[in-house]
């Protein structure tokens, strides 16, 4: 995903050098949560059972962001099944932190 983001950023730089913009979010780096499908990546929603299922297409939100000129460069961790419970954990990655209360 990161390599594709670098390629997209270079393409957007080329457009900008020609005086063109891809949209109102031209070149803005955007992260998406792991519940959104991005072609060629997994959308696990924090579940091990989805780890090897590679998305064949983008979620509508991802397509909208790309159409507006964003650069999607990373997917961020989510608690298992997107359910909010304490602690926010996933069997795939490290502890998911709550941004307002970091000790939880």
Language-model-derived ranges and their functions:
Residues 1-104:
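Gly/Ser-rich catalytic/binding loops embedded in alpha/beta enzyme cores
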């Amino acid at each position: 995903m990161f390599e594709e983001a670098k390629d997209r950023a270079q393409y957007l730089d080329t457009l900008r050098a020609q005086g063109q913009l891809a949209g109102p979010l031209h070149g803005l780096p955007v992260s998406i949560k792991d519940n959104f499908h991005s072609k060629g990546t997994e959308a696990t929603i924090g579940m091990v059972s989805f780890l090897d299922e590679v998305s064949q297409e983008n979620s509508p939100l991802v397509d909208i962001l790309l159409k507006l000129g964003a650069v999607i460069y990373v997917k961020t961790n989510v608690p298992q099944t997107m359910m909010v419970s304490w602690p926010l954990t996933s069997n795939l990655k490290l502890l998911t932190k709550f941004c307002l209360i970091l000790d939880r």
